[in-house]
């Protein structure tokens, strides 16, 4: 082959050469790559998910275990007992626990420094989150020797609602007795600040509450006590579930509260027996020496059992808290009361929407709060306002005194009225108040201290709660008893306005006459500025003339006998009081009823006529209501309440008390 021919062949090869053709991958290789990639992605997801779940389990607290320990010894977290595996997840778990333990140790070190060193020593180098530091600083200040600093710290503690749950639980264990009582008297305080009652001790042989109350009563001293205490104790020990007859009252309601046993107790016999026993314990708790016996014999724990069992019985709960309030009059028992778990109970009850419940708790807490309250509130003296700690200065006292068969709360309720079904659906009575001095007067005059007193009265010795000591029912005895209680409450240290209904007005006059003769009570007379009378029988009543028609007056009590028309005792009382009232220039306003009152079947009388309600000085205003409703305004904007409010403001100097 020639040279030219070879060149031609090479040129043709070069001209026909093009880009290299790619070789197509077979489907077998594609499936293999997909399997490997999918396995890697799926395995990675499974691994990450496993790590997240493992870490979450390691950091999650067993809340059920915490709640169980909280009931036994309050707040003690349990330790985890899971086995640790030799794996990456186990390593993360161990590392997390170590970090948590370090944080816990650091937290305890900070706590120790805060509680055991002055504030200025640790604030400069305290290593903690701001909210953690703030809590412990306030807890430290709540124990300050400076009273003003303590009170301010308690207010800041209660008003800061950003604390976390564990901080409330920690504070509940750290706060001292004084701070716990103070927190309970702050309005709307968070109840997590208070430890729950400790577990109650197991009773021997599964003893019932009824038997426990009987044993407690039997263990109390029966000698050197007045006859009423002996009577109530013997009555409670004698009655049993089988022999206790159901007590019912009639329609008679002279002072606004019905007969003592007209209030239904429920049909449960055991509950009725418990009520009798609690009434006897109330009488014993009025005796100072018996209070220590009640506590020493396990009374606080037994009352806690009854309280928890009878949460559906407001009357039983009020009697229990009434006993606690009487025990709290003894300062040496305060520590035992607090340690028995009553702070959480009282803090919850004082926030009750029911005024009677809240007022009983307010009295008990005030008697426990020796850091802010100097006065003591004896049995039967209730604080309607202010029931909590307040920064507002109190300028005057207003005292409400009920009448025959009245009560500290129900006498002063809003007027009852018939409500139609349509009105119920519209909710027109949602604003109904159980005690208008608490709901209305306190709102219009927040700088007043409003008190209401209570004492037992009876129309007939047939219905007397304690028929063995008639001298206790006279005006003279009640006057001395109430004067002593009011002095303990600090009444007379500032201007005083008296508001009385029916026989309560006679009692007020007797108290002022007795105070005028006692040098220790001279401030009460000096500071009395005005008296408001609601249908007070200054010159007696016609009630005794109906003894034939009304069976309750067949054997009238001392109270009824003292109300007889043209009674010499009433005449002397009125004349002597008029002399003092004119000399002291008391402001006086009297309301008189004009509508007859139903006091029994087919019996309707004008209980206190206008001429008997006329004291002889001051204004007399006749109102178209009956004897029961003369002290119960229908609404806040009615004449009866507006005129009452105006009188109180005018008697205190013509300025609005705000």
Swiss-Prot record:
UniProt membrane topology term: Single-pass membrane protein
An example Gene Ontology CC term for this record: membrane
Cell division as UniProt keyword: no
Record's keyword terms, sorted: Endoplasmic reticulum, Lipid biosynthesis, Lipid metabolism, Membrane, Mitochondrion, Phospholipid biosynthesis, Phospholipid metabolism, Transmembrane, Transmembrane helix
Regions that span the bilayer: 33-53
Cellular compartments annotated: Membrane; Endoplasmic reticulum; Mitochondrion
InterPro entries the record matches: AB_hydrolase_fold, ARM-like, ARM-type_fold, SERAC1, ZER1-like_C
Family: Belongs to the SERAC1 family.
Role this protein plays: Plays an important role in the phosphatidylglycerol remodeling that is essential for both mitochondrial function and intracellular cholesterol trafficking. May catalyze the remodeling of phosphatidylglycerol and be involved in the transacylation-acylation reaction to produce phosphatidylglycerol-36:1. May be involved in bis(monoacylglycerol)phosphate biosynthetic pathway.
Protein name: Protein SERAC1
Species in which this protein is naturally found: Danio rerio
Annotated gene: serac1
